[in-house]
């Protein structure tokens, strides 16, 4: 069911691209098909490589790969899709199709409702499944946080922003990528990901590198000394985000310094993750806006 849903979304996006692109529809169709093919190949290769490296057995990797357990391959597929579009379509065509790509991303996220989702958070004890639209049962019937739903909402919001900015003639691809990357750092806090580097998830580091690359002034567009202020600000907030991640994973260490009684200690342990999640969400929005402004100035050549 999930694979059929993915295939339907790809076909609908291709049809939408042909409708939106008024000139040179043949080249648009070729570029879209090439990007889809590159994404599929990269997704398969990356997923198989990750399984082989984790299991250490070629037979086990083939068995698990045939069952479709290749969640981390989505990252490689997305990168291949974007790079192919950038190389073949050119900047202007990619800018025009940016809202469509964001709608495609939102649709792919929402399609996880019909398959084992990659964007499912940890189990929530004592919470009924119907308590919130952000709650979904996993394969064992336990209520979990459906992180893919706010991720889809973020993509829809970015699609609306890209459509409005595109009509004003402003570059949209870099700013939207910055906002999505910054917000994804927060969404990764809510996921149960086994890929860890210390207490920070590797996906968060990848998103931070995207932000730094967008603000990097070494492309020749921006060589003013003030350009490095963007990078320093983003890197500093990334470090703070890492500390918040540590506080969410190890709340009892913070609670020991805040309370000495049993009741106070329990209350502090419960409060620390909530406060850190709120701070992380606000910090993600600020990081996204700062990086978006830097990326837009780079795109405009200022």
Q: What label would you give each PLM region?
A:
Residues 1-302:
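Hydrophobic, membrane-interfacing alpha helices
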């Amino acid at each position: 069911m999930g694979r059929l849903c993915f295939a339907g979304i790809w076909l609908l996006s291709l049809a939408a691209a042909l409708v939106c692109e008024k000139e040179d529809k043949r080249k648009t169709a070729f570029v879209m098909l090439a990007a889809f093919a590159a994404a599929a190949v990269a997704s398969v290769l990356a997923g198989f490589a990750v399984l082989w490296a984790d299991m250490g057995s070629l037979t086990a990797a083939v068995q698990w790969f045939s069952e479709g357990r290749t969640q981390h391959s989505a990252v490689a597929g997305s990168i291949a899709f974007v790079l192919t579009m950038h190389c073949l379509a050119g900047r202007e065509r990619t800018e025009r199709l940016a809202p469509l790509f964001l709608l495609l991303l939102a649709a792919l996220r929402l399609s996880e409702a019909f398959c084992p989702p990659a964007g499912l958070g940890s189990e929530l004890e004592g919470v009924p499944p119907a308590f919130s639209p952000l709650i979904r049962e996993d394969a064992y019937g336990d209520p979990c946080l459906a992180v893919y739903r706010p991720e889809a909402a973020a993509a829809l919001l970015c699609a609306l922003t890209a459509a409005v900015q595109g009509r004003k003639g402003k570059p949209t691809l870099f700013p939207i990528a910055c906002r999505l990357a910054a917000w994804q750092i927060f969404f990764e806090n809510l996921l149960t990901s086994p890929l860890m580097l210390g207490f920070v998830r590797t996906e968060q580091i990848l998103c931070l590198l995207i932000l730094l690359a967008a603000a990097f002034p070494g492309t020749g567009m921006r060589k003013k000394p003030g350009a490095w202020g963007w990078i320093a600000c983003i890197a500093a907030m990334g470090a703070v985000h890492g500390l918040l991640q540590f506080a969410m994973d190890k709340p009892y260490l913070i609670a020991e310094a805040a309370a000495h009684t049993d009741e106070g200690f329990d209350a502090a342990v419960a409060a620390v993750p909530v406060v850190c999640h709120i701070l992380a969400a606000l910090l993600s929005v600020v990081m996204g806006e700062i990086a978006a402004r830097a990326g837009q100035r780079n795109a405009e050549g200022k």
